[in-house]
Amino acid sequence: ELKGKKLGIHAYGNVGRNVARIAKGFGMEIFAFDAFCPKEVIEKDGVKAVDSADELYSACDVVSLHIPTTAETKNSINYALVNKLPKGGVLVNTARKEVINEAELIQLMEERGDLKYMTDIMPAAHETFAAKFVGRYFSTPKKMGAQTAEANINAGIAAAQQIVGFLKDGCEKFRVNKK
């Protein structure tokens, strides 16, 4: 049952915003933390902005990760942070596997039989997770976010529109290598 559950969105970019939109349809209470997104932007969407990752994990039944892998975020989802989840907490990783400190998450899940972990990219320690946490761990074999025919078509259309926007108007909104 998702209705009435508290969902935490860790990073409120495009994917995080869409997760919030969908979760609202299930009647979830939505919280978000993003170190780079202004609170006003988050709250404009009817989402409760919090001041820290610690606050997000403490407040929410489910946390959905959308952070990129950077030097600062690598292994940042660790024992201390995930242990803040309330009893029965669920961590959903649709970000990158490198943000998870797998050894610490395994240790925590051994200590807390109430935690669940779901990820759409197979962790390096998949066999350990699968053997030790039956019914509390789920993984897909590879990053599945854009592996449908529709997603690939939409990605092609979006790329074409962005190229036209750049050539026609000089729009650099989606430029990757900003100077």
Model segments located where?
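A structural signal for isolated positions on well-ordered beta-strands in alpha/beta enzyme cores
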Residues: G8, F31, K116-M118
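Residues at the starts of beta-strands that form the adenosine-phosphate
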Residues: A20, M28-E29
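Short, structured coil segments at secondary-structure junctions
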Residues: F26, D45-G46, F133-R136
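Glycine-rich NAD(P)-binding loop of Rossmann-like domains
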Residues: E1-N18
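C-terminal helix-to-coil terminal segments
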Residues: K116, I121-K179
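Short, flexible hinge/linker loops that cap or flank conserved catalytic cores
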Residues: E1-K3, K24, N83
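Rossmann-like adenosine-cofactor binding region
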Residues: F36-A131
